[in-house]
Design a protein with these regions (language model features):
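Glycine-rich beta-to-alpha transition loops that act as phosphate-gripper elements at the mouths
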Residues: 1-3, 19-24, 43-46, 66-72
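Hydrophobic faces of well-ordered beta-strands that scaffold small-molecule active sites
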Residues: 17-20, 38-40, 63-68, 85-89
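C-terminal helical cap(s) of enzyme catalytic domains, especially alpha/beta-barrels
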Residues: 10-16, 96-123
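Catalytic cores of alpha/beta
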Residues: 25-33, 70-86
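Short beta-strand/loop segments at the ligand-binding rim of alpha/beta enzyme cores
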Residues: 5, 9-18, 58-66
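Glycine-rich phosphate-binding active-site loops on the catalytic face of alpha/beta enzymes
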Residues: 1-6, 39-48, 83-105
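N-terminal active-site wall of soluble small-molecule enzyme domains
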Residues: 1-12, 24-32, 48-49
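Conserved, mostly hydrophobic/aromatic
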Residues: 38, 78, 113
C-alpha cells in the first residue's frame, strides 16, 4: 500500500521506492511527491489494465508495475500498454519449485516468460 511516512522517508534518504497505489487518491499522492513509477496490486482483482489506464490518464509521465493475477493469458494486455514499466507474477515460479530445488525447470519457465515478454514488447 501507500504509506506516506515510508515514501517520504525513502525520498529523503534517496532510497528507490515504488509504493502500491490501488486508487486514484494514492496515485495522486505519489505524483504529488514526484514519483514516476508505482506498483499496482492486486492488478486483476482491482480492475486490471482498464483501471490502470483510467488512473494514469491525467499523468503522462507515470508508469505502473502491476502484479497479482497476471499470467500468460493476460500478459499481452499489460505489456502492450505504454503505461506499464514491467509486470510481476508468481505464475512464473511457484514456491514449491524453489523448495524442491527444481531449478532446471524454473530456468525453462523464466526463459519462456522472458521470450513471451520480448515478443509482446518488441514485435
Amino acid at each position: 500500500g501507500f504509506d506516506p511516512e515510508i515514501v517520504d522517508y525513502c525520498l529523503k534518504k534517496n532510497i528507490p521506492v515504488f509504493p502500491g497505489c490501488i486508487s486514484p487518491s494514492e496515485v495522486a499522492q505519489a505524483v504529488k511527491r514526484g514519483l514516476k513509477v508505482v506498483k499496482f496490486f492486486p492488478a486483476e482483482q482491482a480492475g486490471g489494465i482498464a483501471m490502470i489506464k483510467a488512473m494514469a490518464a491525467p499523468y503522462q509521465h507515470l508508469k505502473f508495475m502491476p502484479t497479482g493475477g497476471i499470467n500468460t493469458g493476460n500478459l499481452k494486455d499489460y505489456l502492450s500498454c505504454d503505461k506499464i514499466l514491467c509486470c510481476g507474477g508468481s505464475w512464473m515460479v511457484k514456491g514449491d519449485m524453489i523448495r524442491n530445488g527444481e531449478f532446471d525447470q524454473i530456468q525453462v519457465m523464466v526463459k519462456e516468460a522472458k521470450e513471451l515478454a520480448d515478443e509482446i514488447r518488441f514485435n
